[in-house]
C-alpha cells in the first residue's frame, strides 16, 4: 500500500495539474507508515514544486523544515522498493532542512548545512540539487568556505 501511494503521487506529479490529489496521496502514505522516510521526502518535493498553494511562505517553509527533520529521524527505516524510485535519501533531507531553515530564521544552521552538503564527499545527490546547493552558497556569500 505504501509504495502504491508513493507511485500514485509520483505519476500524478509527472502529469501535473492535480496538486491537491498529490498532497493527499503523500499524506495517506505518511499515515500508513509514519516511521518510513520516503513519504517525508515526497512531501518536501511537493512543497518545493507546489508549495505556492500554501497560504503563506512562512507556513510552507515551517512545514518543509518539519518534514525534513522527521525524515532525518526515520532515515534508517528506508527500504528498497520494487517500483518507486524517487526517494533521494539523507542528503535531500539536509537540503530541504537547509533551504527551509534559511526562510524561517535559522540562518546559521542553514549555512552550516549547505556547507556540509557541499563539503561531504558522500553527498550522492543528483545534479539538480548540486547546482542549487552551489548557487545558494554563492548567494549566501560563503563560497570561500567550500573545500576544493
What are these regions (language model features)?
Residues 34-35, 76, 122-124:
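Short coil turns that delineate tetratricopeptide repeat
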Residues 1-3, 37-38, 91, 125:
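Helix-start (N-cap) detector for alpha-helical repeat units in TPR-like alpha-solenoids
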Residues 15-16, 50, 58, 104:
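Structural motif corresponding to the intra-repeat A-B loop/turn of tetratricopeptide repeats
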Residues 5-7, 42-45, 49, 93-99, ...:
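"A position-specific structural signal for the A-helix of alpha-solenoid helical repeats
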Residues 18, 35, 82-89, 129-132:
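Structural signature of alpha-solenoid helical repeat junctions
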Residues 27-31, 66, 70-73, 119:
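Conserved structural position within tetratricopeptide repeats
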Amino acid at each position: 500500500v505504501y509504495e502504491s501511494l508513493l507511485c500514485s503521487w509520483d505519476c500524478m506529479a509527472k502529469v501535473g495539474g492535480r496538486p491537491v490529489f498529490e498532497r493527499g496521496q503523500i499524506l495517506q502514505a505518511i499515515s500508513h507508515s509514519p516511521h518510513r522516510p520516503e513519504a517525508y521526502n515526497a512531501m518536501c518535493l511537493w512543497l518545493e514544486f507546489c508549495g505556492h498553494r500554501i497560504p503563506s511562505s512562512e507556513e510552507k517553509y515551517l512545514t518543509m523544515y518539519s518534514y525534513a527533520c522527521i525524515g532525518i529521524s526515520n532515515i534508517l527505516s528506508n527500504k528498497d522498493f520494487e517500483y518507486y524510485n524517487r526517494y533521494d535519501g539523507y542528503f535531500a533531507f539536509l537540503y530541504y532542512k537547509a533551504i527551509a531553515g534559511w526562510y524561517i530564521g535559522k540562518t546559521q544552521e542553514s549555512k552550516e548545512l549547505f556547507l556540509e552538503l557541499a563539503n561531504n564527499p558522500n553527498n550522492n545527490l543528483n545534479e539538480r540539487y548540486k547546482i542549487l546547493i552551489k548557487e545558494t552558497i554563492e548567494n549566501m556569500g560563503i563560497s570561500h568556505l567550500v573545500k576544493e
